[in-house]
Structures are given as C-alpha cells and as structure tokens.
C-alpha cells in the first residue's frame, strides 16, 4: 500500500477512499458500459467480456437488487432489473458469436456460452459450445488457440470453461434470474 495511507481497520480504509462509482451503467444503445465514457461499438466483436463479469462468472447482474439499501443513494441513475438484463444481453450480442476476427480462442466461446446460460438462452448456449468443440478442440479434447496454425498453442482455459458453462446451464435450465 501507499506509505502515506495509514489505516487500522477496514472501516477506516473505507472512510479514506473516494466512494466508488456505481458498478454499472447503461449506454444509450442500450448496452452495458465497458469504459467510463460512451465508446461502445456494436460492431466490435472483441473476445473479452470484462464488462459482463457481473453476468458470468459473477452473479451481480442476474441477481441485481435495485433497492437503495443495496445500491445506495446518490445522483447516479437507478436501473431496474429488466434494464440491467436487457443491457447485458445487448452487450453480449454486440460482442458477436465467436466468429469475429479476434475470436480464435475456445475460452471466449465457453465464456459466452456460460453467459447465455445465465440469461436462460439454451439455443445460443448450445451453439457457442458446439462451435467451440468444432473449431477449437482437437481429437484428444485439448483446446487450441488457433487449430489452423501449423504450430498451434494449447490453451487450457477452454478446457476449464467448457465444463463450467455446462454446470451453469445445468443449474439454470430455464432462467438463472427471477424477474421481480
């Protein structure tokens, strides 16, 4: 830690740091905001879904509670659960289906599959996992970053992500969230 920051307890630390901005904001598109400014591009099919970590592997999006006792009070815009789920869905659609120029890896397809499972979309979940198996897994079931490369790179992430996505789907046969 910074030598100038002296705290004796978690409460003291919380009192010294600037309150964090709300963890979530919705763009005019409407999609989840990834940056502090509106720079979302619906054509950006980049493989990372860091702005959707609250959807998967987290649960802050599907279990969103808009009550002031949870979200706090202040000048930030308040959202309801339906708006949050819709924005996460739009963001996931904007990031593509794993066929974009930056989508060679199996792990991102497994992550997308798990995110679709969280949203209760079984057909897209199945498409993503089937596509990952077809495009990124060898006969020995090792995941390769780019199987068409003459010297392909083994990448374990998809091997862990695939069963994790299946477990999410098994846990969420219809919907992982209840619209209240």
Predicted segments, located by residue:
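Active-site core of glycosidic bond-cleaving carbohydrate-active enzymes
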Residues: 1-179
């Amino acid at each position: 830690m910074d030598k100038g920051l002296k705290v004796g307890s978690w409460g003291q630390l919380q009192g010294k740091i600037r309150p964090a901005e709300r963890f979530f904001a919705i763009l005019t598109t409407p999609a989840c905001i990834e940056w502090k400014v509106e720079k979302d591009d619906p054509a950006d099919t980049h493989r990372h879904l860091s702005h959707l970590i609250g959807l998967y592997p987290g649960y802050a999006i599907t279990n969103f509670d808009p009550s002031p006792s949870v979200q706090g009070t202040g000048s930030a815009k308040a959202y309801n659960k339906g708006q949050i789920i819709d924005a996460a869905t739009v963001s996931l659609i904007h990031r593509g289906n794993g066929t974009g120029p930056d989508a060679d890896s199996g792990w991102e397809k497994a992550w997308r599959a798990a995110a679709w499972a969280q949203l209760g979309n079984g057909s897209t979940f199945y498409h993503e996992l089937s596509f990952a198996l077809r495009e990124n897994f060898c006969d020995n079931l090792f995941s390769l970053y780019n199987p068409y490369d003459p010297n392909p790179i083994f990448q374990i992430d998809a091997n862990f992500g695939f069963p994790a996505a299946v477990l999410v789907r098994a846990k969420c046969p219809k919907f992982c969230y209840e619209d209240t």
